[in-house]
């Protein structure tokens, strides 16, 4: 009896006719997309990458350049990961034109810079990992992403000041926002290397 009473409460009393909703076979549905070139959506073709290293790389690349290897921003930063020319020189790349035309070189450069930053910030990673600073849980991947944005020195200042020294790039993106957005990824397999080169 109770089941019958409850199930009758979910049945429509009157069915409505929605003929306006149906599409005639002769009608054409048009959709407008931002771009017709599939190459504009390279980063979106990846499968689910989760919190693995590939997810870290692709998420950071998408934030930096929408994942485009040929991107040069208004400040002259280059490639998928938006490297400055000086930073490229520190990891052994002298020819920026070759760098821009070689996706494999850009990927190797990203890993080399991670190794170098991990070595530079190895003490901070040990000391601050797991702590909450300026409302952000500090993780190794967050520290490395923030170092990619503003350099190891800016990350060190932020951490040592307990978040009081707010560092931002020229576009206004903060170190702490990168720490938050890119925290919790698997970067522990990247070895720290003071002399990392491509």
Predicted segments, located by residue:
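Sec-dependent N-terminal signal peptides
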Residues: 1-2
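Solvent-exposed, acidic/flexible segments
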Residues: 46-54, 73-81, 99-107, 137-141, ...
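Short, solvent-exposed loop/turn elements at domain surfaces
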Residues: 67-72, 89-91, 157
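Catalytic and substrate-binding regions of cell-wall glycan-acting enzymes that process beta-1,4-linked
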Residues: 133-193
């Amino acid at each position: 009896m109770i089941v019958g009473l409850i199930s009758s409460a979910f049945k429509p009393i009157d069915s409505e006719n929605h003929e306006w909703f149906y599409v005639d076979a002769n009608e054409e549905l048009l959709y407008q997309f931002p771009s017709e070139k599939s190459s504009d959506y390279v980063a979106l073709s990846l499968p689910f990458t989760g919190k693995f290293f590939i997810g870290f790389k692709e998420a950071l690349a998408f934030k930096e350049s929408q994942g485009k290897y040929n991107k040069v921003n208004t400040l002259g930063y280059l490639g998928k990961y938006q490297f400055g020319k000086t930073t490229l020189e520190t990891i052994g790349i002298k020819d920026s034109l070759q760098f821009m035309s070689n996706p494999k070189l850009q990927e190797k450069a990203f890993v080399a810079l991670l190794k170098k930053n991990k070595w530079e910030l190895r003490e901070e990673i040990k000391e601050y990992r797991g702590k909450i600073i300026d409302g952000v849980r500090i993780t190794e991947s967050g520290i490395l992403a923030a170092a990619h944005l503003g350099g190891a020195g800016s990350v060190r200042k932020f951490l040592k000041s307990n978040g009081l020294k707010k560092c931002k790039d020229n576009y206004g993106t903060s170190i702490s926002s990168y720490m938050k957005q890119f925290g919790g990824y698997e970067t522990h397999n990247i070895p720290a290397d003071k002399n990392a080169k491509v």
